[in-house]
Amino acid sequence: VWTGVAKVMRDRGVDDLAFVQHEAAQGELFAFGISEAGNDLVLFGSDTDAAPDPDGGYRFTGTKIFTSLAPVWTRMGLHGLDTTSPDGPWMVYAFIDRPEAGAGDAASIVTRDDWNTVGMRGTQSRTTELHAAYAPANRVARRVAPGPNPDPIVFGIFSVFEILLAAVYDGIGARALELAVATVQKRRSKQSGTTYSQDPDIRWRIADAALAHDAIAPQIQSLARDVDGLVDHGARWFSLLSGVKVRSTETARKVVDDAIRVSGGSSYFASNELSRLYRDVLAGIFHPSDDESAHATMAAALLGPVATPTDKPA
């Protein structure tokens, strides 16, 4: 995600994350330290405290969840809320290094061994505790006002994260459809003696899954081109990006479900690839933007914000 964010920002004339691209090319592994339990503000707020120091750096204290590749990352990009600076509050985006084992600051970052999940087990997205974890001044990328914000780093994270997520889950749907097609061409009906690929109900279900699946990739590709092409969607950007993520993850769930329905009881065994896809695709409902957030974002883009009791009718 972070290398993509660096590109989006550079394309818009902001080179604050050039070091991310250089270090990633040298083999450094950048973790994504944004998610926090119960923080539905996501990029617009944080429960992690960002305490400034006199040298311009920050110390972060809080808990991040779903930190992918937790056992092996070497850098973490994260955010926190600075409530103590005189000109604040600020949302602070910065990067911290993983301390060497036995180093004096080793206890500042604790990786819990808690990734015991239904699916996506290979990502090892464990919980990370931050205890005054330090980002020096040259690794403090941006300070932006809390709340919805068009700052390049906010747009960069949102656009790259949503588009990449949509692509991953679209890929899960594609693989499930591929497995379903292969399976029904081999399974035979005792009643008819023909393969299930000749059964009209099976054919309809696979076709229905494929029709839904085929609609997603062009949407992902179109938005990705718009991001790269600096297209200005204005206030619609966040609704477009959250929308494609939700449509992709929800469609992938339907496609996987249909694939299992036509593939028979063998797909219920844990050793079956469709069983793994069934477990993995469920994670899509937990990634931001969730269904509720996407609907709220779309409504705000089209209808404006919800009126407060003191607002007068237009």
What positions do the PLM features span?
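Glycine-rich beta->alpha junctions and the first turn(s) of the following alpha-helix
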Residues: T117-H213
